[in-house]
Amino acid sequence: TDRTREIVAEYTATYPFIRLIDNPDRIVPPAMNKGILASKGDVIMRLDAHSTYASNYFSVLVKALYDLGADNVGAVCKTDVLNKTPKTLAIKEVLSNKFGVGNSTFRTGIDRVMEVDTVPFGCWRRDVFDKYGLYDVRLVRNQDIELNKRILRGGGKICIVPDTYCTYLARETFSALAKNNYGNGKWNILTVFYTKQFDSLSIRHFVPLAFVLSLILPMLFSFLFWPLSLLSVLSLIAYTLLLGTISAKLSVSKKLHFGYLLASFVVLHVSYGWGSLVGLLSLPFQPKK
């Protein structure tokens, strides 16, 4: 419906080395695996839609891959929005802020080459997939993070470089932001469930779940001992104070809408944490894969 096939056909008419490979599974891991297995070169690079790439993206990453002796390299992924309004600019800022996305280096920016636990998209030597395996086809999301953790677990090296960048076009409505992060949160739990490796993800991926549980669990157990409800109140007060302080500073320093900043942070954190909680509750009903 988005003219993908037509667009690819236009490119193949000009560049005959481009090939379109069908992916009936309609999720990322099988698509990547089909592409990797069909590849003929020494370097694999993943480029996702809804993103744009700097003109030197290819050359910088391929050079860094060999110069650094890395198994995977990537660059900072800047966040932007297509339609710039007070709401979308607030969402953009929240998705680039440490209070929004944690210590996610590739989102918050770097000024030097760093070894990291994951990078967006990726640039690998082809033989890396022979050594560490292909994408895990069970994972609808987080498949890139899981692959990178597997590489590190096997003694590999992942680097992020500052000399190029890509730009991700973020969701522009609160409903779309919530839907996306609900799915991310849910698949954090399912990723650990299917891989049986807690370190398939990082601690930051579970902070929203901890926040949501800090609100819900004390209230549930307060039926047995009512003072426990105060823990929920304290958690909410602490979050509100932190949220208000950070949003106020961003509003003043970057001239952004205070209310939209508040709403963006809350939607991001609560939808992500709620998704993780739903994922946790769904574990007894998950099929074995």
Report the location of each language-model feature.
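Short, conserved alpha-helix that lines the donor NDP-sugar binding/gating region
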Residues: 5, 9, 28-37, 148-149
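Catalytic donor/gating beta->alpha subdomain of glycosyltransferases that bind UDP-sugars
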Residues: 81, 136-199
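A conserved acidic beta->alpha catalytic loop
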Residues: 1-6, 25, 48-52
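Conserved donor NDP-sugar-binding/catalytic core segment of glycosyltransferases
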Residues: 56-89, 93, 165, 169
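Short aromatic/hydrophobic "clamp" motif used to bind/position activated sugar donors
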Residues: 44
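Membrane-embedded multi-pass helical conduit in multi-pass membrane proteins
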Residues: 210-285
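Glycine-rich, basic loop-to-helix element that forms the pyrophosphate-binding segment
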Residues: 20-39, 60
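A recurrent flexible, glycine/aromatic-enriched loop bordering the glycosyltransferase active site
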Residues: 79, 102-127, 139-140, 146, ...
